[in-house]
């Protein structure tokens, strides 16, 4: 059933992000333009596509082409044809400024919220790494928040429990 695209595996907490982003929107309300800005292999992208019922367009972006290739493969297997994958390009981002109804940023983080799955993470963290990842998060927020149209919505998510990677980032 998995190989046929009948289901995808995803962490329970990850399942909360797509409904939060879509809010009260339903496919009957018309189409949406959604950006998934740190899409990776696309777990949340595929969930968004499922909830959107094939309506609208999802642009899934990442800096790693191999992850986007995996997302394309998974989307095809799942019959999610409203997903466009794009490597992050400054020219594209500039052209798309203010054009997305909804923007999801599932930012890279320390991973402190998923220690039960990756217990060795706590031994690998250094103050320097945390400073670097927070700096990356600031850059990502500054870059992708410009994609949201007036009246649109941005959801910023991490799998960290640190306020410095969550609330403090969006309050800047």
What are these model-derived regions, one by one?
Residues 1-172:
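S-adenosylmethionine
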């Amino acid at each position: 059933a998995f190989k046929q695209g009948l289901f995808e595996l995803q962490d329970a907490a990850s399942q909360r992000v797509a409904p939060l982003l879509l809010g009260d929107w339903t496919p009957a309300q018309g189409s949406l333009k959604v950006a998934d800005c740190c899409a990776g292999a696309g777990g949340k992208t595929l969930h968004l596509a499922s909830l959107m019922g094939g309506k609208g367009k999802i642009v899934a972006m990442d800096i790693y082409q191999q992850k986007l290739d995996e997302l394309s493969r998974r989307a095809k297997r799942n019959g999610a044809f409203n997903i466009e994958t794009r490597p992050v390009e400054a020219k594209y981002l500039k052209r798309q400024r203010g054009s997305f109804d909804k923007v999801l940023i599932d930012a890279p983080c320390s991973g402190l919220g998923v220690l039960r799955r990756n217990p060795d993470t706590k031994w690998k963290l250094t103050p320097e790494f945390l400073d670097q990842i927070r700096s990356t998060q600031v850059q990502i927020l500054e870059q992708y928040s410009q994609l949201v149209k007036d009246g649109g919505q941005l959801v910023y998510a991490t799998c960290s429990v640190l306020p410095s990677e969550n609330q403090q980032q969006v309050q800047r």
